[in-house]
Curated annotation (Swiss-Prot):
Tagged with keyword Oxidoreductase: no
Organism: Homo sapiens
Annotated compartments: Cytoplasm
Protein name: Protein S100-A14
GO cellular component annotations of the record: extracellular exosome; extracellular space; perinuclear region of cytoplasm
Organs and tissues of expression: Expressed at highest levels in colon and at moderate levels in thymus, kidney, liver, small intestine, and lung. Low expression in heart and no expression is seen in brain, skeletal muscle, spleen, placenta and peripheral blood leukocytes.
Gene3D superfamilies to which the protein is assigned, alphabetical: EF-hand
SUPFAM superfamilies: EF-hand
């Protein structure tokens, strides 16, 4: 895949809703990835992110809790952004819209 441009304050006005959502996911990932490198989350960081940022999706989505359990409690275990993205995809599958959104 190609390189993405870096988001800054000037570009934010041009972003679509989906682009802003992706940017928010990236920022949240980096905000919580403090113990190791900025490119990975430890099990405790992932648990903090999920419980604080996905409180309504977490109880209904076993995939997230299972992934945390699979990482174990050892903070030597790391979750890369790609795996985090897959978890977000699994969480999104549990979201049901009340009615379809049209015109976007």
């Amino acid at each position: 895949m190609g390189q993405c441009r870096s988001a800054n304050a000037e570009d934010a006005q041009e972003f679509s809703d989906v682009e802003r959502a992706i940017e928010t996911l990236i920022k949240n990932f980096h905000q919580y990835s403090v113990e190791g490198g900025k490119e990975t989350l430890t099990p405790s960081e992932l648990r903090d992110l999920v419980t604080q940022q996905l409180p309504h999706l977490m109880p209904s989505n076993c995939g997230l809790e299972e992934k945390i359990a699979n990482l174990g409690s050892c903070n030597d275990s790391k979750l890369e952004f790609r795996s985090f993205w897959e978890l977000i995809g699994e969480a999104a599958k549990s979201v049901k819209l009340e009615r379809p959104v049209r015109g976007h």
